[in-house]
Structure formats: C-alpha cells, structure tokens
C-alpha cells in the first residue's frame, strides 16, 4: 500500500494538468513510476483504502492468457472491464473491422497468442515463453508484447500495460511489466494484481520459484472528475494490513489455464478494506 499511496500523493502534489484528446478531459499527470511486488514472499498488492474487486482483475488477465477478443468471454470469466470499450466507444463502433456486439478486435491477448506474421501465419508468444522457461531456458527475449502498431486500427483500444518481460536466474523467475498509461484511481489496483498474479501463475506452471515483479508506469494520471474522491476520500483513510493470495496447486500447465481454470481456483485471505468508491470511467 505504501508505494501506491506515495504515487497518488505525488500526482496530487507534483502533477501537471494535461488535456486528454481521446476523452476530452483533463488529467493531473506525472511521468515515470516504478513499483515492485515481492511475489516470492506472497506480498499481495491489494488496495485496502477502498474495496478492490481482485477477482475481476485476475479474470481479465486470464482472458488475456487465453487470447480472448470478445467482451462476452471476459464476462463469463467474471470481468466486465471490456463492455464499455467494445460497445460504447463511438470510434470503434464506426470501425469496419468491428465484427459486432462485444467484439474487441485484435487487442491484448490476441496479440500475445496470435501475433500476425507477414507470411500469413501467427506467433504464439506466450507458449514460446512457457516452453522455454519449463526447459530452464532464458534467451534474454522471453517477452510477451501486446503492442502491435500495425494493427491498432483493428482493435477498440491500444494496450496500456503492453509488455511483460520474464527473466530466469537459476530456478527463480522474475517479471518486468511495462505500462504506457495508467488511470491510477480506477486501473492501478487492477494492474498491480495482474502483474503479481501473472508472475505467480507462470512460475507455477513452469516449475520455478517466483521472485520479484517490477512494474514500470510511464504516464500516471488522475482524471479531473476523479480528483476530489481520491484526495478528499480515499487518501483520508487509514490502510489495513495486507492480504495474501492462494492459487490452486493443481494448475500445472498453460493448457490448464486455457481450459478449466476459474476464479474459484484463486483465494484471497485476510482482506480488510474500506468501502468501495465509484470512480468515473472515461471511455
């Protein structure tokens, strides 16, 4: 919680007002934030100064792992996070590449599991990473990238958290995750959970020990219609002791994650939190 609260206060104290063209709103913005999560010690970065819907965050990451491109598939897992971008973004609604209701296009996990090649084939980045790590191989390029500028026009949203770089030292697995943009009041609690859980899951299915996860954010911001709630409500609350995350040990392969895993395979214990805060969402 400490590094989360420090970033929120830094944005309020040092941020610059920037006009966001996509949303038509101003954002109080800082550049560069580095957060770390000790996954090996099970220091789960779950926000306690408001209720955090951690199951939705993990469900969304599971959808990325499966390469989903439809908001209905995310809803079936327990995440409604893509409903608005798939169905309420006017630019996407007018896009000829949109296939219909709930279609997200070639975003996030689609790129991670089926990156298009010039010869007409696809690259499954995640499978290559998992296969290498299971064999004890780190080629210094165990990189999962969702950022494909050549296909931005074929999706409803550019990826915010766009790259995950895995590194193996002995039998300990590390993760560096890179995020170009972060809606701190709404998105950061999700993103923290996702970075942590991604390392925990990939370590588990490759037979490695999880180490540290390093989370780099470039543009961290608070929208103008979120500022009062963050400054006058959430930051006035005292944080509780951190919770811990347990993952079903029967999850042993990428195929398991692709087929039968549900939110019932994840459990958070000791989660004390303040009341939920409904921050405005900007499509």
UniProtKB/Swiss-Prot annotation:
Question: Where, by residue number, is the active site?
Answer: 160
Primary site of residence: cytoplasm
Q: What is its EC number?
A: 2.1.1.45
User: InterPro entries from the entry?
Assistant: Thymidate_synth/dCMP_Mease (IPR045097), Thymidate_synth/dCMP_Mease_dom (IPR023451), Thymidate_synth/dCMP_Mease_sf (IPR036926), Thymidylate_synthase (IPR000398)
* Cellular localisation: Cytoplasm
Which cellular component, as a GO term, is one annotated location?
Answer: cytosol
What keywords does the record list, in alphabetical order? Cytoplasm, Methyltransferase, Nucleotide biosynthesis, Transferase
In terms of CDD domains, this protein maps to: TS_Pyrimidine_HMase
User: Where is (6R)-5,10-methylene-5,6,7,8-tetrahydrofolate annotated to bind?
Assistant: 183, 282
Q: Is Acetylation there in the keyword field?
A: no
One GO molecular-function entry: thymidylate synthase activity
List the SUPFAM superfamilies. Thymidylate synthase/dCMP hydroxymethylase
Q: In which pathway does it act?
A: Pyrimidine metabolism; dTTP biosynthesis
Catalysed reactions, semicolon-separated: dUMP + (6R)-5,10-methylene-5,6,7,8-tetrahydrofolate = 7,8-dihydrofolate + dTMP
Binding positions for dUMP per the UniProt entry: 22, 180-183, 191, 221-223
Q: Which Gene3D superfamilies match?
A: Thymidylate synthase/dCMP hydroxymethylase domain
On whether Methyltransferase is a keyword of this UniProt record, the answer is: yes
GO biological process annotation, one example = dTTP biosynthetic process
Give the superkingdom in one word: Bacteria
* PANTHER family reported in the protein's UniProt record: THYMIDYLATE SYNTHASE, THYMIDYLATE SYNTHASE 1
- HAMAP family per UniProt: Thymidy_synth_bact
Family stated for the protein in its record:
Belongs to the thymidylate synthase family. Bacterial-type ThyA subfamily.
* Main function: Catalyzes the reductive methylation of 2'-deoxyuridine-5'-monophosphate (dUMP) to 2'-deoxythymidine-5'-monophosphate (dTMP) while utilizing 5,10-methylenetetrahydrofolate (mTHF) as the methyl donor and reductant in the reaction, yielding dihydrofolate (DHF) as a by-product. This enzymatic reaction provides an intracellular de novo source of dTMP, an essential precursor for DNA biosynthesis.
What is the protein's quaternary organization? Homodimer.
Protein name stated in the entry? Thymidylate synthase
UniProt source species: Shewanella sediminis (strain HAW-EB3)
């Amino acid at each position: 919680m400490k590094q989360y609260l420090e970033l929120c206060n830094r944005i309020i104290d040092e941020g610059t007002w920037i006009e966001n063209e996509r949303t038509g709103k101003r954002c109080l913005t800082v550049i560069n934030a580095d957060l770390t999560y000790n996954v090996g010690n099970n220091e789960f970065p779950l926000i306690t100064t408001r209720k955090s819907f951690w199951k939705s965050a993990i469900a969304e990451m599971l959808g990325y792992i499966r390469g989903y491109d439809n908001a209905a598939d995310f809803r079936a897992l327990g995440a409604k996070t893509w409903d608005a971008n798939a169905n309420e973004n006017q630019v996407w609604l007018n896009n000829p590449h949109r296939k219909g209701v709930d279609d997200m296009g070639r975003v996030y996990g689609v790129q991670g599991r089926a990156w298009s090649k010039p010869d007409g084939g696809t690259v499954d980045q995640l499978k290559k990473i998992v296969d290498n790590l299971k064999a004890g191989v780190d080629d210094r390029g165990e990189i999962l990238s969702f950022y494909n500028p050549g296909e931005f026009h074929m999706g409803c949203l550019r990826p915010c958290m766009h790259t995950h770089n895995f590194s193996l030292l002995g039998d300990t697995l590390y993760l560096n995750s890179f995020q170009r943009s972060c809606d701190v009041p709404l998105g950061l609690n999700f993103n923290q959970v996702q970075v942590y859980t991604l390392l925990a899951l990939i370590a588990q299915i490759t037979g490695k020990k999880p180490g540290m996860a390093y989370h780099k954010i470039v543009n961290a911001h608070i929208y103008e219609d979120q500022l009062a709630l963050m400054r006058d409500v959430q930051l006035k609350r005292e944080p509780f002791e951190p919770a811990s995350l347990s993952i079903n040990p029967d999850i042993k392969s990428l195929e398991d994650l692709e087929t039968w895993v549900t939110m019932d395979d994840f459990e958070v214990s000791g989660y004390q939190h303040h009341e939920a805060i409904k921050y405005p969402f900007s499509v």
